[in-house]
């Protein structure tokens, strides 16, 4: 028996080595921004593809590869690439695969020559219905010349968050429609963040916005104006608040920007000090008897 098995070991090892080398010609990886996402977030991740094969790979048809000549950006080459890249998403409980709900590509068009690599942004929530809290697994897949190259599966959770406060918006132009805004807390990295969620009475769920770190001394506030503006105020630290502005219409919800605001308890005193320092207001001299 030994005389039969031993000669096969080197051949088996060589075959396994060749198979491993073949499978490592193209590597694809998926890096999640976080391990937990609040319902409605876009679920951002970065796709990392490295081409160690002798071929030029990519997606998008005719794709230009750019280079530099001095300080100028020039076209170095143009390739016709028709490989496939996609992400498979499963519920970890029963390993049921989710259907893709979008028609768009997962990443931007690209072409990679031998020895090149590229990082590409993707938003998993744009392509799959992740509206229910659950644990999911995402696996990146690249297909070239009929060979499927799979990356390491990544697990992430979709959660409701801890509800802090809510507000309701009514629309004069559409009486039957109501929009509920809610602010929720959840950990993100090493700090706690506050998120704005929005859902319409007809079931439409809008994209959840991460408003950044919050210090939970005070509850955050939502103000809904009659003209469609929505303001969120939350405490960033001991002396500073963040004011976020949104524009909310029956068929649109847009983030308009944010600004820093001094702590309301010290803002008045600080303003007076600035006026005195600049000479804008002269201190009033009160007679001593007016204090009695």
Segments (PLM) and residue ranges:
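Surface-exposed loop/turn elements that mediate protein-protein interactions on large endomembrane-trafficking
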Residues: 195-212, 242-260
